């Protein structure tokens, strides 16, 4: 018969006041007095009211004895006690016993003990040290006496076996173990199990300090598990050591016949096969809070009370007092959005506890609640993030604010979807902007230029912020004018252009222009002009002239004044044509257009 999770309550928790001037049965008065004492003992147990209400009379007595034994053990370690197990040497103790009269009496169990000076290090401010240490342990702690009775089990045993701590304390461990593995546990509880066979049992001292390694134990067994739907058992690896249990006389151990001090096994129990992340009974990290219209906290889940280290007497409390100072602006924007539109997008920020100043990474959303068609309160749905997810999303918060424009529960349920911003859907505003920014494909003389509007300007700015590559800006190209085209081709007339012009406006290599002689050749006929080839050009397409090295003629001689050439200086400068799009051009043509632009600009 294996253990099962069954607890029944068979006595009343609240006593009715005795009736006056009525005759009662003495046995009934005795039962009422006994029930009253049991209720008082039950309220002293370190459990919440919901757990205590499910305990029966025998469970209350069993748990009271178990916690008294644990307290007696640690009090015997911290203070001089007549129950100190002097029958075993110090090698079987968890730490060296040294009485400390100056230390005031404390009923706190030491979490860390300094072996150098033998002093317990208690930190009253570290209220959640036990919870943190159990999470980092990767298993639960189990203490067994030499008769196989569970002396102590940590609170997180429920996360691995499904049994509450109150179900297993002061119960035989064999009810939790498979019948084929019970003999292995009995052998491990025997202090002479690991004695070398070559040594005589009467000459070998297993409790000597040099033989302390023979007190170490390591065994695996199949434990009854209520969380396993396949076979109902979970293989657990038990690794620990035999130690003396102080403050526990031999007569207190159930079924014990041998006299003398009690020796027990203290071990750490971890799953033999580490469970996958999906199999772990993860804590529900979805939390909810209720706020006034100004953001003040009015109610919240019990987990939020523990996180923020506040109680109901502190309410109402301004929410901005709990938000990290660097995230107050983000919270204010979400608050304003909820007031205006009834809901806000997802926001990532940090909450800071009031006492220990611990930081929590939170992903939340706001919604407005109405009563009689009027705003009544604001509800926030929170999801706790780990430090890696929170730091990553905080770095991308500027990008997320531009994309998460509407509330979506799917992102709240799966915050890992937000780690890749490329997977987020684009809002409809950006899609409309992309449609209006498509390059024109009409065969006009010059490409159409869309008029920049505030919408397109914002879209371009968002596109630049979200882009991961730096796109080089192509310099603006001036529009060729009537005079400029006559310089390239004297036969060009206004309104008449080659047939291929609409298809490629700036592809000048197809029409090699005829450059006039520079004015410098008129004043200096003896100067030898050498053709120069520019890199990236075809030598047969365009030739530019360059003066010899070291020849610097006078500017007036280089350009002599002529009355017929006055229109050169009076001709207006070509206007710059700003295009919002970068048209793909070939590499060779790009250098050519740049040189032509410089020539026309001068």
Swiss-Prot record:
Domain called bHLH: residue spans: 18-71
* Nucleus recorded as keyword: yes
Nuclear localization signal 2: where is this motif? Answer: 28-33
Motif Nuclear localization signal 1 residues? Answer: 5-8
Q: Which domain of life is it from?
A: Eukaryota
Cell compartment(s), UniProt: Nucleus
Instruction: For this UniProt record, give its keywords in alphabetical order, as a comma-separated list.
Output: Activator, Behavior, DNA-binding, Neurogenesis, Nucleus, Receptor, Transcription, Transcription regulation
The primary site where this protein sits is nucleus
Q: Which Pfam families match?
A: PAS, PAS_3
- Location of region: Disordered: 1-28, 440-467
Q: Does the keyword Transcription apply?
A: yes
| Bias-annotated ranges (Basic residues) | 1-12
Give GO terms: molecular function aspect only: DNA binding; nuclear receptor activity; protein heterodimerization activity; RNA polymerase II-specific DNA-binding transcription factor binding; sequence-specific double-stranded DNA binding; transcription cis-regulatory region binding
So which tissues is this one expressed in? Expressed in many distinct neuronal cells including RMED, RMEV, RMEL and RMER. Functions in URX neurons to promote aggregation behavior.
* Cellular component terms per the entry's GO annotation: aryl hydrocarbon receptor complex; nuclear aryl hydrocarbon receptor complex; nucleus
Effect of gene knockout: Defects in neuronal differentiation, axon branching, aberrant cell migration and abnormal aggregation behavior on lawns of bacterial food.
Task: Give any single GO term for biological process.
Answer: regulation of transcription by RNA polymerase II
Q: Identify the residues that the record assigns to the PAS domain, covering every copy.
A: 126-196
Segments for region (Required for maintaining the overall integrity of the AHR:ARNT heterodimer and its transcriptional activity): 41-73, 133-141, 266-268
Q: Which residues form the propeptide?
A: 1-2
PANTHER family registered for this protein in UniProt: ARYL HYDROCARBON RECEPTOR, SPINELESS, ISOFORM C
The record's function comment reads: Probable ligand-activated transcriptional activator. Acts as a transcriptional regulator in GABAergic motor neuron cell fate specification and development. Promotes cell-type-specific expression of guanylate cyclase genes that have key roles in aggregation behavior and hyperoxia avoidance. Has no role in carbon dioxide avoidance.
Its quaternary structure?
Answer: Interacts with daf-21/hsp90. Interacts with aha-1.
Protein name according to UniProt: Aryl hydrocarbon receptor protein 1
């Amino acid at each position: 018969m294996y253990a099962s999770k069954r607890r029944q309550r068979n006595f009343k928790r609240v006593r009715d006041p005795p009736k006056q001037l009525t005759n009662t049965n003495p046995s009934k008065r005795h039962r009422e007095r006994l029930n009253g004492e049991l209720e008082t003992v039950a309220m002293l147990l370190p459990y919440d009211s919901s757990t205590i209400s499910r305990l029966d009379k025998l469970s209350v007595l069993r748990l009271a004895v178990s916690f008294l034994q644990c307290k007696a053990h640690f009090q015997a370690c911290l203070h001089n006690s007549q129950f100190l197990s002097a029958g075993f040497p110090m090698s079987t103790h968890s730490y060296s016993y040294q009485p400390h009269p100056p230390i005031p009496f404390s009923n706190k169990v030491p979490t860390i003990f300094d072996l150098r000076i033998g002093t317990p290090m208690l930190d009253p401010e570290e209220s959640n040290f036990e919870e943190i240490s159990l999470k980092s342990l990767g298993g639960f702690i189990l203490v067994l006496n030499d008769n196989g009775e569970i002396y102590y089990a940590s609170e997180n045993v429920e996360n691995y076996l499904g049994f509450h701590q109150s179900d297993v304390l002061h119960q035989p461990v064999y009810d939790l173990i498979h019948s084929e593995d019970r003999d292995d546990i009995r052998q491990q509880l025997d202090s002479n199990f690991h004695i070398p066979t070559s040594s005589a049992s009467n000459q070998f001292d297993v409790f000597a300090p040099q033989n302390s390694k023979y007190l170490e134990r390591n065994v695996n067994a199949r434990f009854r598990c209520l969380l396993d739907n396949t076979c109902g058992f979970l293989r657990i690896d038990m690794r620990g050591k035999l130690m003396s249990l102080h403050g526990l006389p031999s007569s207190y151990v159930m079924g014990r016949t041998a006299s003398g001090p009690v020796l027990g096994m203290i071990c750490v129990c971890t799953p033999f096969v580490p469970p996958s992340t999906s199999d772990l009974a993860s804590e529900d990290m979805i939390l909810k809070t209720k706020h006034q219209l100004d953001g003040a906290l009015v109610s919240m889940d019990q987990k939020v009370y523990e996180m923020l280290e506040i109680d109901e007497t502190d309410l109402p409390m301004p929410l901005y007092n709990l938000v990290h100072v660097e995230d107050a602006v983000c919270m204010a924007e979400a608050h304003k959005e909820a007031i205006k539109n009834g809901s806000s997008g997802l926001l990532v920020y940090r909450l800071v506890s009031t006492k220990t100043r611990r930081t929590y990474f939170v992903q939340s959303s706001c919604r407005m609640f109405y009563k009689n068609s009027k705003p009544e309160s604001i509800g926030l749905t929170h999801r706790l993030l780990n430090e890696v997810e929170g730091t990553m999303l905080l770095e991308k918060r500027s990008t997320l604010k531009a994309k998460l424009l509407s509330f979506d529960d799917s992102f709240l349920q799966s915050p890992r979807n937000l780690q890749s911003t490329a997977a987020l859907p684009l809002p409809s505003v950006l899609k409309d902007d992309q449609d209006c920014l498509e390059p024109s494909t009409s065969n006009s003389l010059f490409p159409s230029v869309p008029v920049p509007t505030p919408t397109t300007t914002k879209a371009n700015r968002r596109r630049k912020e979200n882009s991961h590559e730096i796109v080089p800006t192509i310099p603006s190209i001036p529009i060729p004018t009537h005079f400029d085209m006559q310089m390239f081709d004297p036969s060009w007339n206004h309104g008449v252009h080659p047939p291929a012009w609409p298809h490629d406006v700036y592809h000048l290599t197809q029409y090699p222009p005829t450059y006039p002689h520079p004015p410098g050749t008129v004043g200096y006929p003896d100067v030898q002009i050498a053709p120069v080839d520019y890199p990236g050009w075809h030598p047969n397409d365009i030739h530019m002239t360059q003066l010899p090295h070291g020849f610097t003629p006078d500017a007036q001689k280089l350009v002599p004044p002529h009355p017929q050439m006055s229109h050169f200086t009076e001709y207006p400068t070509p206007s710059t044509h700003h295009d919002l799009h970068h048209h793909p051009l070939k590499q060779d043509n790009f250098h050519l257009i740049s040189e032509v632009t410089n020539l026309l600009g001068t």
